[in-house]
Regions:
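Glycine- and other small-residue-rich loops at beta-strand/loop junctions that grip anionic moieties
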Residues: 17, 62, 66, 93, ...
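Short, acidic Gly/Pro/Ser/Thr-rich loop/turn segments
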Residues: 44-46, 98-100, 119
Length: 193
């Protein structure tokens, strides 16, 4: 509806290409006089309220991450094993430019460790030591917008190795690059723990 389109254009929960889906659907549907629908929005927050609480009352965790991919994978798993998705208890991991780890049960994404508070990824910085991050930001001369861009698109493998493609990192390792192996192993270990 118009409220959703306004929200996505003016105050999105996060900056992401998927925000365009509802806007494009609305632009196509309105002139034709037909309804437009989106399914399984990327910012649907089903996280258990108790899991949103942090050590600062002004800040809370958000149930935003790679929900579309992880939910689809969980549903596929349930289908392939003759189960109802709502009856499954699963941990599902999305490995892409960002990494999200989800706990799914009762037909919902009940908890998520997303690319802001979890492991670093090919492009994302992941969770960082908060005091060091605050000091670094204060000394960096960057604006908040520049810092967020660095953390979202120039962190992780890009920051350490200059590439965001795991296949390139694997080639570096095959060619004997010990630093690339260390960084890749660190990323894998962060996902596993």
């Amino acid at each position: 509806n118009d409220d959703m389109v306004w929200q996505l254009k003016n105050k999105p929960a996060m900056e992401h290409a998927s925000n365009l889906g509802a806007i494009i659907a609305d632009a196509i549907a309105k002139p034709l006089g037909i309804p437009a629908f989106i399914y399984d929005g990327v910012t649907v927050d089903e996280m258990m309220p108790i899991l949103k609480i942090t050590g600062l009352k002004e800040l809370s965790r958000k149930g935003i991450g790679h929900n579309l991919n992880t939910r689809a994978a969980a549903m596929k798993y349930a289908r392939e094993h003759g189960k109802e998705y709502k009856d499954c208890k699963l941990i599902v991991v999305h490995l892409g430019g960002g990494i999200s780890i989800t706990l799914q049960y009762g037909g919902k994404v009940a908890d998520i460790i997303n690319d802001e508070d979890g492991p670093f990824a090919p492009e994302r910085a992941g969770g960082l030591p908060s005091q060091d991050l605050i000091k670094y930001f204060g000394q960096s001369g960057m604006t908040a917008k520049e810092m967020l861009k660095k953390m979202k698109s120039r962190g992780g493998l890009v920051a350490h190795l200059g590439v965001n493609d795991s296949r390139e990192v694997e080639k570096m390792i095959e060619n004997g690059d010990e630093h690339a192996k260390l960084i890749y192993d660190a990323m894998a270990l962060n996902v596993a723990r």
